[in-house]
């Protein structure tokens, strides 16, 4: 092995999945990858399954915490810093890559105190608290979307690391001529109940002759009631609690209605898919709206704020594009033009460049 690399990412799939893509690239180049996470995040399931050693530190966020937690926070942060220092001194990594989550704060500071080159990557169009704090001390600051960070010599716009099988060329789908449009509705692994309620009502108002084929991922807790909503309004739909093969789902789809998480937006570009984007209204710093605007500005997507989009409005917008397939083709081309197939390699290149000094 050429040396150890320490990846820091935790909490949600939006941080962990891009980090796993980077881990595979490091391994392909002959490096041993270790992972720094927290005991409660999704990394506790995904990282061991990927065969990577997972080191845990105790750290949590401060937003929305009560006075008692805030008083205890400095001691807890100091404890997590010492835990991260211990891991880094044990591993002696050639570089540390942080992709977000609470773990990256103490982990990034520990890297700096140990003189280990630090690279950070921000998946969203608005930088998270940890990455904003670490940007001044990082050797490279990678961003998925342009201008997330202030301009500097160390800023690098890379895109988001996305699984290679999601990248589809313009000929991967059957032509739209002579068939129904395929509509994919995604609410994330837990489902998005506002979408589960809105879509059946809206699609019932779309004329039958242009109504799309529907595949709706509703979440495990909401799949049965969502299917019943479709039956109630006499709309045929394939409702699933979860979609495990996203590559196949994207290859089937012609249009997607979904939230605007950073990874979802990047996957839409990779798959060359037009989208109606309904950002999560309570996302921190409204980052999902900013993510969505990346597609909307280029004509690859339409922004539908949850608070102001009713069934009639959604039905009208759907009917417009369903009656004019050339609009969907144009949106798909624009989405494909935004894809960053080299994102994973670019992030890893940046890490190894600073590791070499």
Curated annotation (Swiss-Prot):
GO cellular component: plasma membrane
Amino-acid positions noted as binding UDP-N-acetyl-alpha-D-glucosamine in the UniProt annotation, renumbered to this chain: 12-14, 124, 163, 189, 243, 262-267, 288
The protein's enzyme class: transferase
Membrane topology: Peripheral membrane protein
EC number annotated for this UniProt entry: 2.4.1.227
Keywords: Cell cycle, Cell division, Cell inner membrane, Cell membrane, Cell shape, Cell wall biogenesis/degradation, Glycosyltransferase, Membrane, Peptidoglycan synthesis, Transferase
Pathway(s) annotated for this protein in UniProt: Cell wall biogenesis; peptidoglycan biosynthesis
Listed transmembrane segments: none
GO molecular function, one term: UDP-N-acetyl-D-glucosamine:N-acetylmuramoyl-L-alanyl-D-glutamyl-meso-2,6-diaminopimelyl-D-alanyl-D-alanine-diphosphoundecaprenol 4-beta-N-acetylglucosaminlytransferase activity
Function as written in the Swiss-Prot or TrEMBL entry: Cell wall formation. Catalyzes the transfer of a GlcNAc subunit on undecaprenyl-pyrophosphoryl-MurNAc-pentapeptide (lipid intermediate I) to form undecaprenyl-pyrophosphoryl-MurNAc-(pentapeptide)GlcNAc (lipid intermediate II).
PANTHER family assigned to the protein according to its UniProt record, in alphabetical order: GLYCOSYLTRANSFERASE, UDP-N-ACETYLGLUCOSAMINE--N-ACETYLMURAMYL-(PENTAPEPTIDE) PYROPHOSPHORYL-UNDECAPRENOL N-ACETYLGLUCOSAMINE TRANSFERASE 1
NCBIfam families in the cross-refs: murG
Name under which the protein is recorded: UDP-N-acetylglucosamine--N-acetylmuramyl-(pentapeptide) pyrophosphoryl-undecaprenol N-acetylglucosamine transferase
Species the sequence originates in: Pseudomonas paraeruginosa (strain DSM 24068 / PA7) (Pseudomonas aeruginosa (strain PA7))
Source species taxonomy: Bacteria, Pseudomonadati, Pseudomonadota, Gammaproteobacteria, Pseudomonadales
Recorded name of the encoding gene: murG
């Amino acid at each position: 092995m050429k040396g150890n690399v320490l990846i820091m990412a935790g909490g949600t799939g939006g941080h962990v999945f891009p980090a796993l893509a980077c881990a595979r690239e490091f391994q392909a180049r002959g490096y041993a990858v270790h992972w720094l996470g927290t005991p409660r995040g999704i990394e506790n399931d995904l990282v061991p399954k990927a065969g990577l050693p997972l080191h845990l530190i105790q750290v949590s966020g401060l937003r929305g915490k009560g006075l008692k937690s805030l008083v205890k926070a400095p001691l807890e942060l100091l404890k997590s810093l010492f835990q991260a220092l211990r891991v880094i001194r044990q591993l002696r990594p050639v570089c540390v890559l942080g992709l977000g989550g609470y773990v990256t704060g103490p982990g990034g500071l520990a890297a700096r105190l140990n003189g280990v080159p630090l690279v950070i990557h921000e998946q969203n169009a608005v930088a998270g608290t940890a990455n904003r704090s670490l940007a001044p001390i990082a050797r490279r600051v990678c961003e998925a979307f342009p201008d997330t960070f202030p301009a500097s010599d160390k800023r690098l716009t890379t895109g988001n690391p996305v699984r290679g099988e999601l990248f589809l060329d313009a000929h991967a789908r059957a032509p739209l001529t002579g068939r129904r449009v395929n509509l994919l509705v995604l609410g994330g692994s837990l489902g998005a109940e506002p979408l589960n309620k809105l879509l059946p009502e809206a699609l019932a108002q779309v004329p039958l002759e242009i109504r799309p084929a529907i595949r709706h991922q509703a979440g495990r807790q909401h799949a049965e009631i969502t299917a019943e909503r479709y039956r109630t309004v006499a709309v045929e739909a394939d409702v699933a609690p979860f979609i495990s093969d996203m590559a196949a789902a994207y290859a089937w789809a012609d249009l997607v209605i979904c939230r605007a998480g950073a990874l979802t937006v990047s996957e839409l570009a990779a798959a060359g898919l037009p989208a109606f984007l309904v950002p999560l209204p309570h996302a921190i710093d409204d980052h999902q709206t900013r993510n969505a605007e990346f597609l909307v500005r280029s004509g690859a997507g339409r922004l539908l704020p949850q608070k102001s989009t009713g069934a009639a409005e959604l039905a009208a917008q759907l009917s417009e594009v369903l009656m004019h397939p050339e609009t969907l083709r144009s949106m798909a081309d624009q989405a494909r033009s935004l894809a960053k197939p080299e994102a994973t390699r670019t992030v890893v290149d940046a890490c190894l460049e600073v590791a070499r000094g």
